A protein has these predicted regions:
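Conserved beta-alpha-beta core of the PfkB/ribokinase-like small-molecule kinase fold
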Residues: 190-259, 280
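Glycine-rich phosphate/adenosyl-contacting loop at the front of the ribokinase-like
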Residues: 3-4, 8-13, 18-26, 30-113, ...
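Conserved phosphate-binding/catalytic region of the ribokinase-like
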Residues: 1-20, 26-27, 31-32, 36-55, ...
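Hydrophobic anchor at the start of a short beta-strand
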Residues: 109-110, 136-137, 213, 272, ...
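Short gly/ser/thr-rich secondary-structure transition/capping motifs
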Residues: 43-45, 171-176, 215-221
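Short, conserved phosphate/pyrophosphate- and ester-handling motifs at nucleotide-, phospho-/glycolipid
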Residues: 103, 239, 306
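Conserved N-terminal subdomain of the carbohydrate kinase-like
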Residues: 56-57, 78-87, 105-189, 353-359
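Alpha-helix/helix-capping structural signal
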Residues: 66, 241-242, 308
């Protein structure tokens, strides 16, 4: 699905009686172009018959953090208590938002459940979601709230010297907020969550969401929130240290990684994709286990590889792919992401991903 098609579907979902002329005016395109897009959506099965009857269950919900990253890198040695000439960058991030962004690039319909303030940064995030075709209509806008912000200062070599993280607004992603959006969650093909949301909200998802639940542990500290709900998780994507925490198994070899995955399966997780860095990915479910090597290539930056991998796993599930193909999608997404300086490689697409997978 193209970004324009996703935008049209969102407008139709909000107003099933909308006319093609109204769609054209809302998107700034011609009526004939709208007709072509609607015809394509009908051929692809997203619109069933006349009257804009939308196919249900064909979307992914991402629950998690939205972040604005503000970074300053000095041109010379940092001088404390002084104004240092340098370069300042502002970029959009957050694990949940990054996963949603990658899924949109992979052609999936995405709905985002998150929270941000009614400040300039919140406006930037909302505009970005609209441009990408991510449905942010269910996002909680907090009056007077500050959109989650990460501020850091780096030296000329790019090493972080000091940082301040303001993610308090993520605490607004409460069980009551999720309950208000339960029908959206229940009708999804898959729900992906990070662990930036409160512990009780993760428990709510585990106990009330009937759609398959995919979890990105994010970090060892935040992964601990998943311990009480492992038995309700469909797909878990830990790295080595996160898997150690969740399984209680010390991992220093492939054999120990396999043991940790077995423990997690015994705890109720249906699928485990355990990253061992350069040693590859161990994918396991009850009746199948395998190793998939990383794809060698030019590495520019590894930032964002985990987020794209989580998106690739959700994409693979939505496309009906098996365990091995999902694992190959995981490593393929990482190889694409690391080729760009940006956290999200704008070249990401389902065509490129499948090519990298060897399909």
């Amino acid at each position: 699905m193209t970004q324009r098609e996703r935008q049209i579907l969102q407008l139709i979902a909000a107003n099933p009686m909308i006319s093609q002329q109204e769609l054209a005016e809302a998107l700034g395109i011609t009526r004939s172009s709208v007709g072509v897009h609607i015809s394509n959506l009908s051929k692809k099965g997203y619109i069933a018959g006349k009257g804009y009857v939308l196919r249900s269950g064909s979307y992914c919900v991402v629950v998690g953090g939205v972040n604005v990253d503000i970074g300053g890198a000095s041109f010379g040695a940092l001088v404390p208590a002084d104004s240092n000439p340098g370069h300042v960058t502002v970029s959009l991030g957050g694990v949940g938002r990054n996963i949603a962004h990658n899924l949109a690039l992979l052609g999936q319909e995405v709905k985002l459940l998150s929270a941000f303030g009614e400040d300039i940064h919140g406006q930037q995030v909302a505009a970005s979601c609209q441009e990408l075709g991510i449905d942010a209509s269910h996002v909680l806008r907090v009056p007077g709230g500050t959109t989650s912000t990460y501020l850091y200062i780096a030296d000329p070599q790019g090493e972080m010297v000091l940082a301040v993280s303001d993610m308090e607004i993520c605490n607004q992603i409460t069980p009551s907020y999720l309950a208000a959006n339960l029908s959206t969650l229940q009708n999804a093909q898959v729900v992906v969550t990070d662990t930036n949301i409160p512990r009780e909200s993760l428990v709510y998802l585990a106990e009330n969401c009937t759609a398959p639940l995919f979890c990105d542990p994010v970090s060892t500290k935040k992964a601990e929130k998943l311990l009480p709900i492992l038995h309700r998780i469909h797909t878990l994507k830990p790295n080595r240290v996160e898997a150690e925490l969740l399984s209680g198994v010390s991992i220093t070899s492939r054999q120990e990684a396999e043991k940790a995955a077995r423990v997690l399966l015994d705890k109720g997780v249906q699928r485990v994709f355990l990253s061992m860095g350069g040693q590859g990915i161990y994918a396991a479910q009850a009746d199948e286990q395998l190793w998939v090597d990383v794809i060698p290539g030019k590495m520019v930056s590894t930032t964002g590889c985990g987020d794209s991998a989580a998106a690739a796993l959700a994409w693979a599930y939505m496309e009906g792919l098996g365990l091995e193909e999902a694992a190959r999608a995981y490593v393929a997404a990482g190889s694409i992401t690391m080729e760009a300086a940006e956290t999200i490689n704008p070249a990401m697409s389902s065509t490129l991903l499948q090519s990298r997978m060897g399909l």
